Amino acid sequence: GLIKPGTLWCGMGNNAETYDQLGPFADVDSCK
């Protein structure tokens, strides 16, 4: 998938299995 640099979550598909893995950039990683 297309993951934004420095994130695990945002993009088409994701590398994080749970919201617990979002870390300090949760808002960005969850594409809010």
From Swiss-Prot:
GO cellular component: a single term: nematocyst
Keyword Secreted attributed: yes
CC cofactor: Ca(2+)
Catalysis performed (reactions): a 1,2-diacyl-sn-glycero-3-phosphocholine + H2O = a 1-acyl-sn-glycero-3-phosphocholine + a fatty acid + H(+)
Record keywords: Hydrolase, Lipid degradation, Lipid metabolism, Nematocyst, Secreted, Toxin
Major place of residence: secreted
GO terms classed as biological process: arachidonate secretion; lipid catabolic process; phospholipid metabolic process
One MF term in the entry's GO annotations: phospholipase A2 activity
EC supergroup of this enzyme: hydrolase
Matching InterPro entries: PLipase_A2_dom, PLipase_A2_dom_sf
Cofactor note: Binds 1 Ca(2+) ion per subunit.
Subcellular location field: Secreted; Nematocyst
This protein's record includes keyword Lipid metabolism: yes
EC number: 3.1.1.4
Function: PLA2 catalyzes the calcium-dependent hydrolysis of the 2-acyl groups in 3-sn-phosphoglycerides.
Family: Belongs to the phospholipase A2 family. Group III subfamily.
The protein's name: Toxic phospholipase A2
Organism: Rhopilema nomadica (Mediteranean medusa)
